[in-house]
Regions:
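Intrinsic low-complexity, intrinsically disordered segments enriched in polar/basic residues
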Residues: 2, 17-24
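N-terminal secretory/targeting leader peptides
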Residues: 24-118, 126-234
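Bacterial N-terminal signal peptides that target proteins for export
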Residues: 1-10
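Bacterial N-terminal signal peptides
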Residues: 9-19
């Protein structure tokens, strides 16, 4: 089992969230862009407890503005927002970020990790720290990792063997490893943004997508791809 990971990125130092020495006339706005909608555990945590804690502990000196479900903009807009200071934090998939450093494609290797403990050992150690620094060359600092869960295939029609899935169009990320893995499974990878996936499944542009359960349900993918294949490959 390999766990789908998200990377929390920032252009700000951790000290940004510490109380200012003097009260300000207006709060400093901290903008956070998230990939998932309200209803997803990660989004609800940041919209709820994280926002409340920061604003209370700083006595209102900081205000947390959350842009969920790519409402700030697409992947490119989020990266540029971090680089130019329009965003202070963002959650993003290593698969997408791998275009800036191929080492991040390690997360697209299927069946690499046996369980959560193995993932935590990897990311809390030397490898995780090195990967967190991989985006500094483009002005982005990796702040930490979020486990979104194990990936399964969500399909608009069922299949029981890989032979039945042959040539089915599957939504893929921009990662070359993810695309190659999908081809190795005998499927036809179709790279597209996560925000376009629901419509693509609804219109039949793709037959399925591999994603964790929380992300699928919060995005209502089960409405257009009701057949769950328990592959557990990521």
């Amino acid at each position: 089992m390999k766990l789908f990971k998200a990377m929390l990125c920032s252009v700000a130092a951790l000290s940004l969230l510490l109380p200012a020495a003097h009260a300000q006339a207006a709060p400093t706005v901290v903008k956070i862009a998230l990939t998932q909608p309200t209803g997803h555990p990660t989004t609800d945590l940041i919209r709820g407890q994280f926002k409340k804690t920061i604003e209370e502990k700083t006595n209102g000196r900081f205000r947390i503005d959350v842009f969920d479900n790519y409402s700030f903009g697409n992947f490119e807009a989020v990266v540029q927002g971090l680089q130019f200071g329009m965003l202070q934090f963002a959650q993003e998939s290593p698969s997408n970020l791998s275009i800036y450093d191929p080492k991040l494609m390690i997360f697209d290797l299927p069946y690499l990790m046996p369980d959560y403990d193995a993932v935590n050992i990897l990311l809390d150690g030397k490898v995780g720290k090195e990967l967190s620094r991989s985006l500094e060359k483009i002005g982005i600092k990796g702040m930490g990792w979020i486990a979104l869960g194990t990936r399964f295939y969500w399909m608009n029609k069922p299949f029981h063997t890989m032979a039945e899935a042959k040539s089915m169009k599957i939504r893929a990320t921009a990662s070359k490893v993810h695309i190659s893995m999908t081809k190795a499974f005998g499927m036809n990878p179709t790279p597209m943004a996560w925000s376009e996936t629901f419509t693509a499944l609804q219109q039949g542009t793709v037959a399925g997508v591999d994603v964790d359960i929380h992300s699928a349900v919060s995005a209502n993918l089960h409405e257009v791809a009701p057949h769950l294949v328990l592959s557990g490959h990521f």
